């Protein structure tokens, strides 16, 4: 019960920041139709190796969603047909399933986890970039509000097949599996996977000024471009009547991983030190002698008074 209360408080902080940047909350199904995913070639186990797949009684093959770019893009075809319908920003909190080879460290890396995934649909790259920075700022607010902002760094990482770079938000902890290199004077960080002379030159960084940090990834933001809108035919008519594909972005935060990270970085020798914003309760009231009716009555009065004044 205590852990769930903290999870819910983290979720509410994330929800609040998503709503502030005009995100609309939705809920999508976890069961995935393979036909949609085949259009982007991500049903193929050679391309994506962490699917959980199953079959219905009629032998129809389904998958358990590890992300939702394909199904949401397909749905948005019914809601976006003109540039006047853009931009759109939608997000959800949902349990994801990933057949991870190395599921370990409790809620820091599991095969089943609660995730906030946000998706943006924009007219063009310029409009997308403006929102991308808004999400980045919202993420910084989230990490500050839950008490780990001072240890969390926006980090250049591989853009995969989507873009030159993506950005990860990496929190310093010995429990992490990632390595970043941080320029403490500028605050710029790069993931070990892109730690090359070419990237450092592009970011105007010097190797000798970088400090190695062990970290855990607590969030990420991706520019998707037309990676999904093109094969799934999410197309709009622009202001000149020309047809163009929608420019997309994807932004994730693992709620359970945030909770686990707080425990790792803020605990002391006596146990967990929850930041007030996510602590399961504001205070603990202990009645030391429940056999004494006067003491018990007074304790109940204090308890009722605290509740009336907004304490939990």
Question: Where is each model-derived feature located?
Answer:
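NTP/phosphate- and nucleic-acid-binding module
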Residues: 1-312
């Amino acid at each position: 019960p205590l852990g769930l209360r903290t999870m819910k408080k983290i979720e509410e902080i994330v929800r609040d920041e998503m709503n502030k940047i005009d995100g609309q909350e939705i809920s999508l199904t976890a069961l995935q139709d393979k036909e949609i995913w085949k259009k982007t070639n991500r049903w193929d186990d050679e391309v994506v190796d962490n699917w959980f797949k199953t079959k219905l009684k009629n032998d129809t093959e389904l998958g358990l969603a590890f992300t939702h770019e394909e199904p949401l893009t397909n749905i948005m075809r019914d809601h976006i047909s003109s540039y006047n319908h853009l931009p759109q920003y939608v997000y959800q909190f949902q349990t994801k399933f990933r057949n991870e080879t190395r599921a370990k460290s409790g809620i820091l890396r599991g095969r089943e986890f609660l995730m906030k995934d946000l998706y943006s649909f924009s007219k063009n790259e310029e409009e997308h970039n403006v929102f991308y920075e808004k999400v980045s700022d919202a993420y910084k607010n989230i990490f500050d509000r839950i008490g780990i902002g001072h240890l969390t760094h926006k980090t250049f990482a591989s853009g995969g097949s989507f873009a030159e770079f993506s950005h990860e938000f990496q929190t310093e902890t010995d429990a992490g599996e990632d390595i970043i290199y941080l320029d403490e004077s500028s605050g710029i960080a790069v993931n070990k996977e892109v730690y090359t002379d070419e990237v450092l030159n592009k970011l105007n960084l010097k190797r000798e000024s970088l400090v190695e940090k062990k970290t855990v990834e607590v969030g990420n933001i991706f520019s998707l471009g037309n990676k999904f809108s093109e094969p799934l035919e999410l197309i709009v008519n622009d202001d000149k009547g020309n047809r163009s594909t929608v420019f997309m972005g994807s932004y994730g935060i693992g709620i359970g991983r945030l909770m686990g990270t707080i425990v790792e970085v803020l605990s002391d020798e006596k146990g967990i030190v929850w930041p007030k914003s996510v602590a399961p309760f504001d205070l603990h009231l202990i009645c030391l002698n429940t056999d004494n009716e006067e003491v018990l009555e007074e304790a109940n009065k204090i308890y009722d008074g605290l509740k009336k004044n907004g304490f939990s």
